[in-house]
């Protein structure tokens, strides 16, 4: 994926917008809202056409990449039993 880090231009964190939750740039749409739609198995095309017509498919992909990077960088402290 050559554009893997391109979400950095599409996902922004602004303390004045949604209490600093990550949002899609130039919108007030939280990444969390888009991820919930993905979780409901709604296609990227339907998310753009039916829910957020101001977005592009690349914005939806950026949300998924952002979430993947957050999980990838998370430290897990599991206890072995």
Question: Which residues are covered by each model-predicted region?
Answer:
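Long, charge-rich, low-complexity alpha-helical segments
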Residues: 30-81
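A short, structured beta-strand/loop element
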Residues: 6-46
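Intrinsically disordered, low-complexity and often Lys/Arg-enriched segments
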Residues: 1-7, 79-81
